[in-house]
């Protein structure tokens, strides 16, 4: 289990705009660091992802890791990312309360906007594209936010306290060599797919991805069939063969994101080869 402490603050302008966030994280990890990803990943994510969804001019964070005479903790469930989310969202709630502003509206006007993307946050996290405002508006509509607020006030007059919480969580997933290579972590994080057209017209796919019930292999079969224009029943997928295609495993929501992309690239290459050979046989231009 995680064992974090954080001292955090948010700075506002006289007009109620966030200009900075600051936090010092302390993370106890147990008796030793877990190989190969180590036990400091939680601390790194906490320090780099504080305030990630929001506009601000400055960010200051630090993270300290402590040894303990107890069972070590490692990379579990989001690897530290729930920690900066929890701290950030508490700061947002307190700032909104201080200003007397609705917490949802306060978040909306501080969100990173579509025109700002792609961007690198103050914590060094690259973001290609996010639709934060659209997601919030959809959420508020689905949960009937205005009606809930009215009901909340009515219940409060009767002495019944009901809380309404909103949080914006950005999770870094589908990680590969760009993260692990740069961090020097000795963990395989590539994904490889090999696709072959068999003599009987069937398609054989070798993937390094693993599937423990997520449906990854079904997705790979569908991607292959869609690009090659064949029935899914004609596609055979072979996985988890150490002498076959290489892969990094199923973690960090990366299975279909990376293996699926590798499959798409391989299927497109095979399709181009099929069309080229067919054009030679038929003496026609590839379609």
Task: Report each predicted region and the residues it spans.
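Short acidic (Asp/Glu) and glycine-rich catalytic loops that position anionic groups and cofactors
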Residues: 67-72, 111-120, 200-203, 244-256
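Alpha-helical support elements that line or immediately flank enzyme active sites
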Residues: 38-49, 75-110, 134, 138, ...
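Glycine-rich loop/linker segments at domain edges
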Residues: 3-90, 170, 181-191
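Flexible loop/turn segments at secondary-structure boundaries
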Residues: 28-32, 113-118, 172-177, 203, ...
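Phosphate/diphosphate-binding loops
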Residues: 1-31, 138, 145-147, 260-287
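Helix-loop-helix junctions that connect adjacent transmembrane helices in secondary transporters/permeases
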Residues: 111-202
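Flexible glycine/proline-rich, aromatic-decorated loop/lid segments
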Residues: 27, 59-64, 109, 185-190, ...
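Beta-strand segments within the central parallel beta-sheet cores of soluble alpha/beta enzyme folds
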Residues: 1, 19-24, 103-112, 150-166, ...
């Amino acid at each position: 289990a995680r064992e974090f402490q954080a001292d955090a603050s948010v700075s506002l302008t006289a007009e109620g705009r966030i200009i900075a966030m600051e936090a010092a994280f302390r993370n106890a990890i147990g008796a030793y660091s877990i190989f190969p990803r180590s036990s400091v990943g939680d601390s790194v994510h906490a320090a780099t992802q504080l305030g990630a969804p929001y506009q601000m001019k400055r960010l200051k964070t630090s993270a300290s890791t402590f040894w303990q005479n107890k069972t070590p903790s490692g990379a579990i469930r989001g690897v530290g990312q729930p920690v900066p989310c929890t701290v950030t969202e508490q700061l947002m709630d307190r700032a909104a309360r201080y200003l007397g502003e609705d917490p949802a509206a306060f978040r909306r006007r501080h969100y990173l906007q579509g025109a700002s993307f792609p961007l690198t946050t103050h914590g060094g996290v690259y973001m290609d594209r996010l639709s934060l405002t659209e997601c919030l508006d959809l959420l508020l509509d689905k949960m009937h936010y205005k009606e809930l607020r009215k009901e909340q006030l009515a219940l409060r007059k009767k002495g019944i306290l009901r809380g309404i919480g909103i949080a914006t969580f950005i999770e870094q997933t589908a990680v590969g060599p760009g993260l692990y290579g740069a961090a020097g972590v000795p963990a395989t994080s590539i994904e490889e797919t090999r696709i072959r057209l068999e003599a009987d017209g069937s398609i054989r796919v070798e993937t390094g991805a693993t599937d423990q019930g997520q449906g990854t292999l079904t997705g790979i079969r569908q991607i292959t069939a869609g690009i090659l224009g064949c029935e899914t029943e004609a596609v055979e997928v072979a996985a988890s063969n150490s002498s076959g295609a290489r892969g990094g495993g199923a973690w960090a929501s990366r299975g279909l994101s990376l293996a699926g992309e590798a499959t798409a690239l391989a299927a497109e290459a095979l399709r181009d080869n099929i069309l080229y050979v067919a054009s030679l046989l038929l003496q026609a231009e590839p379609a």
